[in-house]
């Protein structure tokens, strides 16, 4: 099974973050501009939470709050569940299911080195299965 390190090597390690005191509107703009569903909420080098489109929908829109006047701190999900580069894709999927989260920051030596989403994991599993199918077909035809 593929490790998170291998997945990050393929997809890239670009991180998008926001400060806890920033307005939710700014977070939504960054997510839209970067085509991502969540941002790390960072205080310096420390992760204080994650803010996602789901947090926005449930904690701003449904509550009738203003995205321009609400700080990210008020809607972020915390504490954050993290994984290490050695964690398997399978273990990440298990954690996401158990904790009902869609994004996992990846930490190494106390630093955030990437983030994986449920979409990243599904793509990795599909690619791995496709490779296995191709190997089996090659074996059968040889």
Sequence positions of predicted segments:
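Tandem CBS (Bateman) regulatory domains
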Residues: 1-13, 52-82, 88-97, 118-142
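A positional/architectural concept
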Residues: 2-48
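Secondary-structure boundary/capping motif
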Residues: 16, 48, 114, 124-125
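The conserved cystathionine-beta-synthase
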Residues: 17-35, 82-100, 107
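Short, charge-rich amphipathic segments
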Residues: 22-33, 62-74, 110-111
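A glycine-centered beta-loop-beta connector
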Residues: 31-34, 39-55, 96, 104-119
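Short, surface-exposed, polar/charged, turn-prone segments marking secondary-structure boundaries
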Residues: 35, 44-46, 67-70, 77-79, ...
């Amino acid at each position: 099974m593929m490790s998170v390190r291998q997945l990050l090597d393929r997809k890239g390690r670009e991180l998008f973050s926001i400060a806890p005191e920033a307005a939710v509107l700014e977070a939504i703009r960054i997510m839209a501009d970067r085509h991502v569903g969540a941002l790390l909420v960072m205080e310096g080098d420390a992760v204080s939470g994650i803010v996602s489109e789901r947090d926005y929908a449930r904690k701003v829109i449904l509550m009738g709050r203003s995205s321009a006047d609400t700080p990210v701190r008020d809607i972020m999900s915390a504490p954050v569940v993290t994984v290490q580069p050695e964690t398997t894709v399978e273990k990440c999927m298990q954690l996401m299911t158990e904790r009902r989260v869609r994004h996992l920051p990846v930490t190494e030596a106390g630093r955030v080195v990437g983030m994986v989403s449920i979409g990243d994991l599904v793509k990795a599993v599909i690619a791995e299965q496709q490779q296995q199918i191709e190997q089996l077909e090659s074996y059968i035809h040889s």
